[in-house]
């Protein structure tokens, strides 16, 4: 990501590892290897109009019909659905489960199947989508994991996603570009980089980046040891995403009004990358689960505090 090339990190870092572990051999051979070759993009279908943070209350249904599943429902905030080859979809397969999360199953839905459609949802930052599933007839081979065993896959995938949101390479490259810009920009008879307040801002950014890097390395090691916990992933997500928002603010202070010019406007500095990152940065604090909920997870799974008083 440091290089700046397009990189579908939700596909490669968040969904593909779960498919590699839990999908059947055909999916591993076609989809997972397609991801490795850079040929496959996967969107995530979790949130619904009435189910966001409370994901276990989702209503999209999958009903078995022989060797197929009939899927009906709607998802919201399905980023990349307009590009994706598949949607990693959570659907309810048991309407009478004792606990709602025990009636969910995971599917991989090809976006070229009849019955799938999407419409754009424009935000302040990037485009996302509403996706619709109308009597999609899906072969059972696209089911991932056990029937009604989807919750475990969802939580595992979300742990990966929360870490993927705080990879520091792209942000570190932006920091280095701003440092170089400040070193080249005249100010008060010298260079902007020589100003004490600029140095203070950049020092705060550099320190935070080093912390995020160490967190990422620690969690990467945990994944290698198959020991990544919910609390650890949530800690990384909360610290990293909130620091990134602060980082963009500090760098914008250094660049001033030049940093607020959008990429396709005359006078844009650094191709408008800082303006764009600052504008979309807040989505990281609720993508993959709102940070308020992550703090609850840290309290329960990391500090062993009770769910209720």
Task: Show the residue positions of the predicted features.
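Short Ser/Thr-interspersed hydrophobic loop/turn segments at strand-loop and sheet-helix junctions
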Residues: 1, 90-92, 108-113, 134-138, ...
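Internal helix-loop-helix
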Residues: 1-29, 33-38, 80-86, 209, ...
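Glycine-rich phosphate/cofactor-binding loops in nucleotide/flavin-utilizing enzymes
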Residues: 14, 151-160, 164-168, 255-309
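A short, Trp-centered hydrophobic/proline-enriched beta-strand micro-motif
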Residues: 38-46, 90
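A structural signal for short hydrophobic beta-strand segments in well-ordered beta-sheet cores
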Residues: 60-63
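A short core secondary-structure module
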Residues: 68, 72-119
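Glycine-rich beta->alpha junctions and the first turn(s) of the following alpha-helix
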Residues: 116-211, 284, 300
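C-terminal helix-coil-helix/basic helical segment that borders enzyme active sites and/or dimer interfaces
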Residues: 183, 187-191, 210-266
């Amino acid at each position: 990501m440091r290089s700046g090339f397009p990189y579908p990190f939700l596909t490669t870092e968040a969904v593909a590892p779960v498919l590699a572990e839990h999908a059947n051999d055909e999916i591993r051979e076609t989809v997972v290897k397609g991801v490795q070759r850079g040929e496959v993009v996967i969107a995530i279908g979790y949130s619904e109009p009435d189910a966001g943070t409370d994901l276990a209350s989702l209503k999209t249904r999958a009903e078995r019909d022989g060797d197929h599943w009939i899927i009906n429902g709607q998802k919201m905030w399905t980023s990349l659905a307009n590009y994706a080859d598949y949607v990693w979809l959570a659907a309810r397969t048991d309407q009478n489960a004792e606990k709602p999360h025990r009636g969910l199953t995971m599917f991989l839905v090809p976006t070229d199947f009849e019955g799938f459609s999407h419409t754009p949802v424009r935000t302040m930052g990037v485009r996302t989508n509403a996706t619709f599933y109308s009597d999609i007839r899906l072969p059972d081979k696209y089911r991932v994991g056990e029937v009604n065993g989807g919750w475990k896959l969802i939580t595992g995938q979300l742990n990966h996603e929360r870490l993927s949101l705080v990879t520091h390479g792209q942000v570190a490259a932006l920091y280095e570009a701003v440092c170089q810009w400040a070193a080249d920009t005249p100010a008060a008879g010298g260079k902007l980089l020589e100003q004490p307040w600029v140095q203070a801002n950049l020092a705060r950014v550099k320190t935070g980046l080093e912390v995020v890097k160490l967190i990422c390395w620690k969690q990467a090691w945990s994944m290698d040891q198959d020991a990544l916990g919910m609390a650890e992933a949530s800690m990384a997500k909360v610290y990293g995403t909130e620091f990134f928002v602060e980082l963009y603010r500090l760098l914008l202070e250094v660049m001033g009004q030049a940093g607020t010019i959008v990429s396709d406007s005359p006078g844009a500095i650094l191709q408008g990358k800082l303006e764009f990152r600052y504008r979309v940065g807040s989505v990281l604090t609720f993508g993959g689960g709102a940070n308020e909920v992550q703090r609850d997870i840290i309290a329960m799974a990391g500090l062993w505090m009770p769910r209720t008083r």
